[in-house]
From Swiss-Prot:
Pathway where it operates: Amino-acid biosynthesis; L-histidine biosynthesis; L-histidine from 5-phospho-alpha-D-ribose 1-diphosphate: step 2/9
Subcellular localization: Cytoplasm
Name under which the protein is recorded: Phosphoribosyl-ATP pyrophosphatase
Enzyme class: hydrolase
SUPFAM superfamilies: all-alpha NTP pyrophosphatases
Gene that produces this protein: hisE
EC number from the UniProt entry: 3.6.1.31
Keyword vocabulary terms for this entry: Amino-acid biosynthesis, ATP-binding, Cytoplasm, Histidine biosynthesis, Hydrolase, Nucleotide-binding
Keyword Cytoplasm applies: yes
GO molecular function: ATP binding; phosphoribosyl-ATP diphosphatase activity
Length: 87
């Protein structure tokens, strides 16, 4: 099972190596604006799932939001430590 740190490490590797066909690479290439739009979309899906769907559906949507937030972090050159210091 992945956790926040292992996901970030995996995404960082993909950002560095740019494997062909990678969803992460495609999203990074869409830039901060494109990634930001995806974050907003996923946040709305989290809300709707939490409000109207099962806990399992909400957890899945939250995991997708976390993925897109981490891609945004990579696009901005932010590390986990950059974020953790604000928690």
């Amino acid at each position: 099972m992945k956790n926040f740190e292992t996901l970030f490490a995996e995404l960082s590797e993909k950002a560095a190596t740019r494997p062909a066909g990678s969803r992460t690479v495609a999203e990074l290439e869409s830039g901060v604006h494109g990634i930001g739009k995806k974050v907003v979309e996923e946040a709305a899906e989290v809300w709707m799932a939490a409000e109207y769907e099962s806990d399992e559906a909400a957890a899945e949507e939250i995991s997708q939001l976390l993925y897109h937030l981490q891609v945004l972090m990579l696009a901005k050159g932010l590390t986990l430590e950059d974020v953790y210091k604000h928690l």
